[in-house]
Each structure stands twice: as C-alpha cells, then as structure tokens.
Amino acid sequence: PRHAIENMYGRADCIIAAGDCDYGVESTVVKIEGEGVVLLRPGAVTPEMLAEVCPVKLSETLNRPVGESVAPESPGMKYRHYAPDVPMYILDGSDEAVYEFLRDKDDCAVICFDGDRELLAREHAFSLGDRADSASHAHRLFAILNDINAQAHDGKIKAVYARMTPAGGVGLAVFNRLIKAAGYNVIKLD
C-alpha cells in the first residue's frame, strides 16, 4: 500500500489501506461481443478462466500501441502505464544473450528472476520471483516499478531492462503491463 499512498498523496481525500493486493495487477477488462468476450486488458482473471464460461478473443491492440487517433476501449490501453521516468526496454533472448548484453551496462536497473544470479549481483537488480511463478511476478511488478522510479529520481538509474516474462495465465497481464511500461520497446537478442 505504500506505493499507492505515495502515488495518490494529495489527489484523494481519503485512502483506505487494506494491505497488499493478492495479485498486484489491475482488473481484467472485457467487452461483451455476441456470445463471448473480447479481452481488452488482462488481469488476475485470465483468458483461460474466461474460456471456461464463454468464447474469448484477444483485442487486436492488447500488446500493441493504440494509434493517436484511436479512442481506447479501456483504461490503460493507450498510454504508458506505471512507467519509470527513464527509458525502459524488454529483453527477449536466452539467459546467455541477456547476460552478455547487460555486462557493460552501468547505471541501469534490471528486472529479472530469482535464477538470474549474475544479474542479481548487480546494484539495481529487482527479482520478480521464480521464472515460472507468474502470480509472484504479478504481485511484485508495481512495487518494483515504483522502487525503480524512486531510484531514477535520485539519479542512480538511467535506463531499465526487463527480462521477457512468460505470457500464459496471469503472465499475460504481467507481460501487458511490462510492454506498456516499456513503451513497446523490445530488444531481440537471439
């Protein structure tokens, strides 16, 4: 709740702090279309869960930029959300390629996984948890982005590099938030 209080301070008359969220990603947003739904923004209610009760289509703009002249169908679809105030990039590549790419990068934050020992030894490394634990990634993501932004404001971080996350289940919501925070900047390393 600390980050929510800091982000909303002075903008809300009252803040009720009820503790940490179980998931940490905003709600799932869908649009009813015929007998099914179009997923506009993924969240803790996953496409797989929705598919158990109705047909599900993913919005064409789910993980792509929405044009300036296009009205967003859901909050969070158009603009960089929870993005650090420094450039951010998603790294798409093998462990070795990511380690090599980051080896000579200083003054940057790295969002990685518990198994990334070489990366975790860095001064500004932030772990999302075990690579396969998307629920942990969802729970930790916004706190990590807020911590990075605080350090960026102190001048300690000039850029952010995040490992590509698994996109299944709630991982789709994590990937969606990361890709938007990065302004759709993906560096392919392999």
Identify the meaning behind each predicted range.
Residues 1-190:
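Active-site-adjacent structural elements in enzyme catalytic cores
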